[in-house]
Amino acid sequence: MAEVANNEQQAPQFNIQRVYTKDVSFETPNSPAVFQKEWNPEVKLDLDTRSAKLADDVYEVVLSLTVTAQNGGDTAFLCEVQQAGIFSITGLTEPQLAHSLGAYCPNFLFPYARETVGSLVGRGTFPQLNLAPVNFDALFAQYVQQRQAAATAPAAEEANA
């Protein structure tokens, strides 16, 4: 019986406490002239994530999206959204926790951020903008590889000295 209780305590737990918009900005620096041009934009998306421990097993994850649309060499709009969530996460190893905070949570937050961006762009009276899905697992794996390479680079330099 005690063994069953221990197994239940060791089982990973993931709970979403809250999802919220932390910060929003929408700018149309070249309006109204931008509305007079033929619409053929170049859209750039920049992503960033960060996490902070709020309490034991409670974390805030913030997904930041910056969408810039250039049209005819001018900035048509600049949209910035910080979508955040508070998550309770227990029973994970450090690598599993890092993956959850760096990939799983941002993947959960992305649809909310995408909807906010789409809504702001529409309110700016621009054509609908649908952001493509993002593979946060691949981005996190790339981040881990870059950190590992950076950690081994100083050791290699010292060995060559």
Curated annotation (Swiss-Prot):
Superkingdom field: Bacteria
Annotated Gene Ontology cellular component terms: cytoplasm
Keyword NADP listed: no
Subcellular location: Cytoplasm
Family matches, as Pfam families: SecB
Keyword terms, alphabetized: Chaperone, Cytoplasm, Protein transport, Translocation, Transport
GO MF, one annotated term: unfolded protein binding
A GO BP annotation: protein folding
Family: Belongs to the SecB family.
Summary of the function given for this chain in its UniProt record: One of the proteins required for the normal export of preproteins out of the cell cytoplasm. It is a molecular chaperone that binds to a subset of precursor proteins, maintaining them in a translocation-competent state. It also specifically binds to its receptor SecA.
Subunit structure of this chain's protein: Homotetramer, a dimer of dimers. One homotetramer interacts with 1 SecA dimer.
Stated name of the protein: Protein-export protein SecB
Organism taxonomic ancestry: Bacteria, Pseudomonadati, Pseudomonadota, Gammaproteobacteria, Alteromonadales
Gene for this chain: secB
